[in-house]
Every structure is written in structure tokens, then in C-alpha cells.
From Swiss-Prot:
The lineage of its organism: Bacteria, Bacillati, Bacillota, Bacilli, Lactobacillales. Part of the 50S ribosomal subunit. InterPro entries: Ribosomal_uL6-like, Ribosomal_uL6-like_a/b-dom_sf, Ribosomal_uL6_a/b-dom, Ribosomal_uL6_bac-type, Ribosomal_uL6_CS. It comes from the Bacteria. GO terms for biological process: cytoplasmic translation. GO terms for cellular component: cytosolic large ribosomal subunit. Belongs to the universal ribosomal protein uL6 family. The gene is rplF. This is Large ribosomal subunit protein uL6. PROSITE patterns: RIBOSOMAL_L6_1 (PS00525).
Length: 178
């Protein structure tokens, strides 16, 4: 059984949390995030510690309790440190370019793919085959990185495509000739 909901969230220095009728706003050095949570979960702020309490031990309450705690912790970490996902491109002629806030990808198609950065997301290119997606919302960073990867996900025969750094791609044997 998971006990994530019972863990205490410690607010780092410079991070403020405001709770107005379970609409929580977290402000930090990197920005501000707001999210509405279930009215069933009580959010208590005592100094620099946040604790979450559920009214009963039903299965639904336990799931909401753990999820709320994880989302709230991600908000606190996001506004203080931020999140980033790194992607790498493998394939002949595969490269990325930045045009303002737009990411332009050449991934073996007849046309370049263009990805507009959502609000709060920045793209960085340490080299033409590495893409770093960063921002304060873990959810939006993950969705944006997954979308970029989906434009040319790694194929199992040669391994060409866009993958997360450190991702293992299962390879297949090709057809055997006569």
C-alpha cells in the first residue's frame, strides 16, 4: 500500500503557498502555478511544512490523497527548481533548429516539422541533435517532450528517431535473405 499522501512537503526558501478554498497557488523564483484540488482533501500549512489530511480511509480517498500530494509536491519543486527533459535524435540528416520560440525538426520527411513552445516552456539545443525541454510545470514539460518524440519515435530495426536520453529501444532482427 502506498503512503505517499502521508509524507510532509517541505517548502524551500523563497517559495510561498496560498490556499483559497482548495485553489492552491504556489509562487517561487521561477514563476507561479495555480491548480484546483478536491474539496475532500484538507491542505494544512504550518510554517514551512505542508500536510494533507483525508476525511476517511475509503479507497477513493486514499487515491485522491496520494495524487493530490504528488501534484502539490511537483508544483513546489517546479517553481523552485524547474523540470527538464532531454531528447536525442538519431538518424542521417536528423537535426533541430530554433526559430524564436519555435522548434524546427528535420526528421526524414519531405517537410520540416515545426513545434510551437507552449506557454512556460523553453527549448534549448546544446547541439543540433539534442533537444532540452524545460519549464516549471512537470505535466506540460512531459506532454511537450512526448509530442516532440511522437513526431518520429524510434523504430526497432535501425533505432532511428527521437528518443529520451537514456531510453532503451528494443531492437529487432531484420529479415534473413535467401
Amino acid at each position: 500500500m502506498s503512503r505517499i499522501g502521508n509524507k510532509v512537503i517541505v517548502l524551500p526558501a523563497g517559495v510561498e503557498l496560498a490556499n483559497n478554498d482548495n485553489v492552491v497557488t504556489v509562487k517561487g523564483s521561477k514563476g507561479e502555478l495555480t491548480r484546483e484540488f478536491s474539496k475532500d482533501i484538507e491542505i494544512r500549512v504550518e510554517g514551512t511544512e505542508i500536510t494533507l489530511h483525508r476525511p476517511n480511509d475509503s479507497k477513493e480517498m486514499k487515491t485522491i490523497h496520494g495524487t493530490t500530494r504528488a501534484l502539490l509536491n511537483n508544483m513546489v519543486v517546479g517553481v523552485s527548481e524547474g523540470f527538464k527533459k532531454e531528447l536525442e535524435m538519431r538518424g542521417v540528416g536528423y537535426r533541430a533548429q530554433l526559430q524564436g520560440s519555435k522548434l524546427v525538426l528535420a526528421v526524414g520527411k519531405s517537410h520540416p516539422d515545426e513545434v510551437e513552445a507552449p506557454e512556460g516552456i523553453t527549448f534549448e539545443l546544446p547541439n543540433p541533435t539534442t533537444i532540452v525541454v524545460s519549464g516549471i510545470s512537470k505535466e506540460v514539460v512531459g506532454q511537450t517532450a512526448a509530442y516532440v518524440r511522437s513526431l518520429r519515435s524510434p523504430e526497432p530495426y535501425k533505432g532511428k528517431g527521437i528518443r529520451y536520453v537514456g531510453e532503451f529501444v528494443r531492437r529487432k532482427e531484420g529479415k534473413t535473405g535467401k
